[in-house]
């Protein structure tokens, strides 16, 4: 059976992304990864790390499924996209900010055309892209804008001893002071609709059970610690329950992540970034992934950053990237079935 082609963007060239991608050489999992990046950079990083890899130039018309070279050496298909400036491990250069975005644009175009079944992204450095003069808050927002998608949902997921943990966010990269005003009834309703639809379509869960967090301590304590639960969250949950969605909450966030409550749901919806991701990353760091829900294409990512201090050392753990590639392939297979 032919494995789905997954575009893997190598991310910030000074970070750990390129060397994580090298670890996909000889990959025997559920996907055929195609690395998007500067071939000379990848070759140089492989040589510095002592990795014996055969690099093939990716050709869409003659891709083949060649994780192993004819000589038995681990191989990688590379779609070469040249750096804007030379790059050294651990040393950021704003000149390469546009290069990083070109990787994303090419992967997205390939997914939209059907050349790739999905895309998985290695980490980028938001600061260096902004220093290059391009406003950038993250992959999630960038891909939403590029696909003219009015609302997408950021969800991180990973396996724990008690089973899968999936945490979606109502708001993403916002200062904490701006969060309450951003949580409107319309935003919350559309976020829940996207989460529910993609848990069905991308994860194959027939009737998803979603646990919804409150915004305030103690979920507002009956209005004494905030009114958002009463005025925004509860009315939206009541409306969507009336349509048949299995929603529970709003829960106090500090108790929602306890095993007895998590066992009652297939996914959690947190109100803001650190409310949800602190618990998720504590439980799954290094093996968790990021999934963008609501896009017209499939996109997964690692759950960590560029780790400049590890770049070029060979010590970076590729587990999250491996899982991101595998999950992208599984989603693509469900979409086809």
For the regions a language model picked out, list residue spans one by one.
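Anion-binding alpha/beta catalytic cores of soluble intermediary-metabolism enzymes, centered on
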Residues: 1-228, 234-337
């Amino acid at each position: 059976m032919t494995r789905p082609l997954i575009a893997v963007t190598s991310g910030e060239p000074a970070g750990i992304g390129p060397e994580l991608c090298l670890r996909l050489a000889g990959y025997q999992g559920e996907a055929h990864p195609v690395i998007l990046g500067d071939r000379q950079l990848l070759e140089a990083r492989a040589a510095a790390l002592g990795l014996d890899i055969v690099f093939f130039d990716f050709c869409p018309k003659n891709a083949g499924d060649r994780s192993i070279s004819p000589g038995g050496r681990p191989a990688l298909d590379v779609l070469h996209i040249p750096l804007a400036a030379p790059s050294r491990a651990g040393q950021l250069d704003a000149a390469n900010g546009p290069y990083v975005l070109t990787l994303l644009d090419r992967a997205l175009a390939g997914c939209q055309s059907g050349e790739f079944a999905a895309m998985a992204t290695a980490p980028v450095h938001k600061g260096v892209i902004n220093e290059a003069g391009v406003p950038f808050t993250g992959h999630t927002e960038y891909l939403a804008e590029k696909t003219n998608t009015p609302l997408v949902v950021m969800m991180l997921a990973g396996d724990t001893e008690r089973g899968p943990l999936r945490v979606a966010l109502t708001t993403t990269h916002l200062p904490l002071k701006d969060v309450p005003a951003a949580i409107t009834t319309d935003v919350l309703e559309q976020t829940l609709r996207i989460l529910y639809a993609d848990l069905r379509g991308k994860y194959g869960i027939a009737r998803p059970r979603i646990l919804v967090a409150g915004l305030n301590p103690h979920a507002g304590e009956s209005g004494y610690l905030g009114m958002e639960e009463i005025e925004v969250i509860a009315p939206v949950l009541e409306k969507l329950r009336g349509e048949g969605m299995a929603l529970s909450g709003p829960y106090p966030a500090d108790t929602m992540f306890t095993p007895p409550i998590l066992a009652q749901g297939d996914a959690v919806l947190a109100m803001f970034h650190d409310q949800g991701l602190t618990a998720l990353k504590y439980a799954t760091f290094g093996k968790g992934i990021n999934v963008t829900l609501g896009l017209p294409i499939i996109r997964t990512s690692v759950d960590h950053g560029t780790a400049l201090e590890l770049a070029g050392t060979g010590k970076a753990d590729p587990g999250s990237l491996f899982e991101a590639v595998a999950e992208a392939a599984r989603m693509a297979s469900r979409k086809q079935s």
